[in-house]
């Protein structure tokens, strides 16, 4: 059945136009225009990334429960081959200083949402990679066992890392007890680069494509520093509301190891030098 017909049957609306959207590295993404509404449609294989959109829906709902904004979920369904997620389409606007204040407020709402343990009741995805969220008592244990070690193993299996790299990681692990902050778990977005933050009406920040878990909140702060696209002053607003532990700037390179390793696996060896610089430093 053609895609247009599949979606019309689910929405009970006639589609005027279907247009591809950029940013579909993992999913096929479309803008759907009907007589009365505009939607975002995401399509993915049901066999390659099982329950990806179910996990995305749960992540969006968890973020929304904090009071932070996400697109409205319209429908999630599947057929024998594909899974489909239909969301509200967000018309983005240009931003001013108030947007970044609002972003800081929203991020604090996420990060003040806590849990007894680090991790999550279910696994999910970061990009196209499986993310193991088995719960742990300490951030150090979770960071090593659930974040760094799984992607180090994948990178090693792909010949992107060697034995010397593994040895350097082991040396780093022995020092993390003295480096990582001790704070209660925070709900984190988990993949907070600028492409996953939309600029909605009324200077409203809207979070998309979450990879949530309960972790140390500095992982989100780190992601905002990784690729740019965030006003540098937002962190001042954030710190007024929920001050970060002293030394957070120095810990950015440690927390950056996880997204850097994910990018090493997904996009190749251009990320290796930055990883080596950090693990050899310690």
Protein language model annotation of sequence segments:
Residues 19-141:
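ATP-binding pocket architecture of kinase catalytic cores
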Residues 12-19:
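Conserved N-terminal boundary motif of the eukaryotic protein kinase catalytic domain
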Residues 2-9, 115-187, 281:
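An alpha-helical support segment within catalytic cores of ATP-dependent transferases
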Residues 132-144, 153, 184-187, 194, ...:
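Active-site Asp-x-Gly
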């Amino acid at each position: 059945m053609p895609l247009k017909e599949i979606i019309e049957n689910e929405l009970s609306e006639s589609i005027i136009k279907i247009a591809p959207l950029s940013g579909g590295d993992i999913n096929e993404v479309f803008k759907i225009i009907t007589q009365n509404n505009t939607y975002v449609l995401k399509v993915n294989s049901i066999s390659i990334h099982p329950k990806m959109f179910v996990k995305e829906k749960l992540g969006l709902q968890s973020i929304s429960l904090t009071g932070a904004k996400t697109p409205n979920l319209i429908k999630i369904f599947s057929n024998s081959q594909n899974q489909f997620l239909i969301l509200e389409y967000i018309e983005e606007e240009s931003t001013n200083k108030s947007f970044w204040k609002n972003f800081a407020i929203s991020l604090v709402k996420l990060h003040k949402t806590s849990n007894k343990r680090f991790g999550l009741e279910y696994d999910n995805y970061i990009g196209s990679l499986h993310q193991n969220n088995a719960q742990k008592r300490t951030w150090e244990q979770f960071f090593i066992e659930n974040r760094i070690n799984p992607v180090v193993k994948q990178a090693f299996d792909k010949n992107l890392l060697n034995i010397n790299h593994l040895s350097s990681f082991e040396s780093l692990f022995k020092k993390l007890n003295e480096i990582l902050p001790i704070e209660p778990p925070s709900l984190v977005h988990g993949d907070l680069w600028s492409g996953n933050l939309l600029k909605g009406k009324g200077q409203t920040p809207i979070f998309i494509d979450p990879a949530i878990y309960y972790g140390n909140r500095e992982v989100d702060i780190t992601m905002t520093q990784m690729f740019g696209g965030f006003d540098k002053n937002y962190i001042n607003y954030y710190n007024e509301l929920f001050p970060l532990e002293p030394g957070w700037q120095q810990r950015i390179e440690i927390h950056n190891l996880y997204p850097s390793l994910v990018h090493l696996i997904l996009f190749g060896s251009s990320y290796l030098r930055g990883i080596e610089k950090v693990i050899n430093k310690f």
